[in-house]
């Protein structure tokens, strides 16, 4: 990698195989089917990135099923039905990067139905995020500041002229736009006054003029009769904003401990693109930095990445009710993040309890039909010999990342296993899904 140009394009003409395709798909979406891996390998990096970053039309079958699930969530008021609707989108949408980014921002603007207690409000927020997921962060931040679920979550109705509530002002600076250390307590106090009167009425944003403080406030060294919109704009103008976003993007999509130099380079690109995410993401996913060998198989899969990635590759059709439960057991209950900080992820995904649950997941996926049957594509590999089976499963599930010692153990296991071809395949799959290497991407 050219140290002077760390985000220089990766030369895919000399190094694009199923390994690079697998790396991209595992980071930019929730895993892949064998057919998707073949397509990305054959089409190349540029065509694959265009398909991922540009909006693709959804199929008629997808739209029909998605609409039905959405209506079921609304009519029943069931948060579990809303979870099934979103999981279905994550698995079957023609725009998987959009869904991955919707989860990224759901975690960034972490809002829990445990307090909001409204499927329509949570649905509206999710669709608002999706609309702006790969677009203009400025618009997204403005939209979230007026979002009904967010205002309930951070006590907007309690923010009144005589008794300002600092919750939203604090979180927009600490968690949404700037990060710790880039504001003062006085900035928060003054900004809270600017958001007074930003309430919810009849399920909609309502600026309660009688409860809004119209007097002058001083935030980030600037003084004026600011309202909430002005505070959002002031946050977006701070030089720490692109850097804050760069850090989160790098840790989510590239490596757990990016260097300060790399963060600075990425922040400069975010600033260059005026906080527009789509061109930034394309540069990131085509960069030498992204494809460096040391940045592959280094991120711990979140429960969603682990579960959906496994289902994408192995199972069809999927039974969603069991998926909701296992995600909650593994610690990633969508629409119900643990706090305003969201899921911190990384090494925190791995505990003695979660390791046992991940091992149980491998067993349930391969020895029961709790989540659905093995797909026809997967079952078909039983017609091959042990070496061919290990090779194809290694390509689909491990990106050929394991060393030869582990590969030989897998070969030995399959060759010596007793039972039918299907039983031997399931045993091998269970072993692969239990490997430490499978917990990484």
PLM-predicted stretches and their roles:
Residues 2-9, 82-86, 118-327, 439:
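Active-site substrate-binding loop specific to GH73 endo-beta-N-acetylglucosaminidase modules
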Residues 36, 152-156, 409:
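Short amphipathic alpha-helical interface patches used for protein-protein assembly/oligomerization
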Residues 20, 27-132:
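N-terminal accessory alpha/beta regions
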Residues 2-18, 22-33, 238, 242, ...:
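Flexible, low-complexity segments enriched for small/polar residues
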Residues 78-79, 140, 405:
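Amphipathic alpha-helical oligomerization segments
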Residues 69-72, 92, 110, 156-159, ...:
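A ubiquitous short alpha-helical element
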């Amino acid at each position: 990698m050219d140290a002077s140009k760390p985000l220089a394009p990766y030369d895919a003409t000399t190094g694009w195989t199923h390994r690079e395709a697998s790396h991209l798909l595992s980071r930019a979406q929730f895993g892949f089917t064998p057919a998707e891996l073949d397509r990305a390998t054959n089409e190349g990096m540029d065509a694959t990135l265009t398909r991922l970053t540009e909006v693709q039309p959804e199929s008629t079958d997808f739209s029909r099923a998605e609409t039905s699930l959405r209506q079921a969530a609304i009519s029943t008021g069931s948060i579990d039905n809303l979870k099934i609707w979103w999981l279905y989108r994550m698995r079957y949408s023609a725009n998987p990067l959009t869904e991955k980014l919707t989860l990224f921002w759901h975690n960034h603007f972490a809002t829990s139905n445990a307090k909001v207690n409204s499927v329509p409000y949570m649905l509206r927020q999710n669709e608002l995020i999706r609309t702006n997921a790969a677009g203009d962060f400025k618009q997204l931040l403005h939209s979230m500041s007026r979002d009904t679920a967010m205002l309930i979550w951070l006590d907007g109705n309690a923010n009144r002229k005589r008794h300002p509530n600092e919750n939203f002002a604090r979180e927009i600076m600490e968690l949404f736009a700037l990060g710790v250390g880039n504001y003062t307590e006085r900035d928060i106090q003054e900004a809270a006054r600017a958001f007074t009167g930003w309430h919810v009425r009849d399920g909609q944003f309502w600026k309660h003029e009688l409860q809004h403080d119209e007097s002058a406030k001083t935030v980030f060294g600037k003084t004026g009769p600011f309202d909430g919109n002005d505070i959002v704009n002031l946050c977006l103008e701070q030089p720490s904003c692109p850097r804050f976003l760069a850090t989160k993007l790098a840790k989510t999509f590239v490596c757990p401990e990016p260097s300060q130099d790399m963060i600075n380079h990425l922040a400069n690109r975010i600033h260059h693109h005026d906080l527009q995410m789509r061109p930034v993401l394309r540069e990131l996913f085509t960069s030498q930095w992204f494809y460096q060998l040391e940045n592959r198989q280094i991120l711990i899969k979140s429960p969603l990445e682990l579960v959906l990635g496994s289902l994408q590759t192995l199972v069809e059709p999927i039974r969603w009710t069991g998926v909701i439960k296992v995600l909650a057991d593994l610690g990633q209950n969508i629409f119900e993040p643990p706090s305003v900080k969201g899921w911190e992820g990384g090494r925190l995904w791995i505990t003695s309890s979660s390791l046992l649950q991940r091992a149980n997941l491998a067993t349930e996926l391969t020895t029961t039909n709790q989540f659905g049957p093995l797909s026809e594509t997967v079952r078909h590999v039983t017609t091959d010999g042990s070496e061919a089976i290990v090779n194809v499963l290694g390509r689909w599930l491990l990106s050929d990342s394991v060393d030869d010692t582990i590969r030989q153990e897998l070969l030995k296991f399959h060759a010596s296993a007793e039972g039918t071809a299907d039983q031997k395949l399931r045993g091998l799959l269970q072993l692969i899904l239990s490997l430490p290497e499978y917990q990484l991407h």
